[in-house]
Amino acid sequence: MNKNRQLAVNSNILFRKWLNGTREMVQDTIFHSRLHKVNQKIRSKRMFFEQDVHSNYFSFYKKKDFFKENPVSYVRNKDFTNVLKKLKKGKYYPDIFLDLHGLNQYQARKKLGQLIAICQKEKMFCAHIMHGYGKNILKKQIPFWLSQHPDIVAFHQAPKMFGNDAAIMVIIEIHS
C-alpha cells in the first residue's frame, strides 16, 4: 500500500510540474435562448383561446322554445336544405366522434367548443356527438347550443348505426 501511495504522490507531482505555466481557459459556452419553448407555450395558449371562443357562442340565457317542432333537426338557412336531407338519409359519415357521457353542462359546452375548433383546424366537416340517454339534460341543451354557433351548417339526430336518438350528427362550415 505504501508503494501505491508513493506512486500516486510522485505522479501527482509530475503532473503539476508538467502543467506549470498553464492558465485556466475562459468559459466560452454559448447559452441558447428558450425560443422553442416560448413558441410552444404561445401555440398552446392560442389553441386554448380559440377553443374557448367557440364555447362562448353557447349560451344558457337565450329563448329555449326555439325547437318546438323537431328538436333534433336544424339547418342554418334554406340554401343548405340538401345538406340536411343527405344528413337525414345517412349519406355523411362522421370524421370525428365526441362522447359527452358523464359530463356536466359546463364541461359539455367546453368540449363542443374544442370539437368545433379541432374540426376547423383539421378541415373535418362532419362530426358525431354522443350525448347518451341519462336525464335528457344534454339531449335538450346540445341542439340549442349548436343552433347558436355561426359555424354550424346543419345537424340532425344520428342514424341508427351511429346511436339513433342518443347522438347528433353535425355539419360544420370549414373556413379556408
UniProtKB/Swiss-Prot annotation:
It comes from Buchnera aphidicola subsp. Schizaphis graminum (strain Sg). Belongs to the SmrB family. GO terms for biological process: rescue of stalled ribosome. The keyword Hydrolase applies. The keyword Repeat does not apply. This is Ribosome rescue factor SmrB. InterPro entries: Smr_dom, Smr_dom_sf, SmrB-like. Disulfide bonds: none annotated. It holds the Pfam family Smr. It comes from the Bacteria. Acts as a ribosome collision sensor. Detects stalled/collided disomes (pairs of ribosomes where the leading ribosome is stalled and a second ribosome has collided with it) and endonucleolytically cleaves mRNA at the 5' boundary of the stalled ribosome. Stalled/collided disomes form a new interface (primarily via the 30S subunits) that binds SmrB. Cleaved mRNA becomes available for tmRNA ligation, leading to ribosomal subunit dissociation and rescue of stalled ribosomes. Residues 98-173 form the Smr domain. One of its GO terms (molecular function) is RNA endonuclease activity. Associates with collided ribosomes, but not with correctly translating polysomes. The lineage of its organism: Bacteria, Pseudomonadati, Pseudomonadota, Gammaproteobacteria, Enterobacterales.
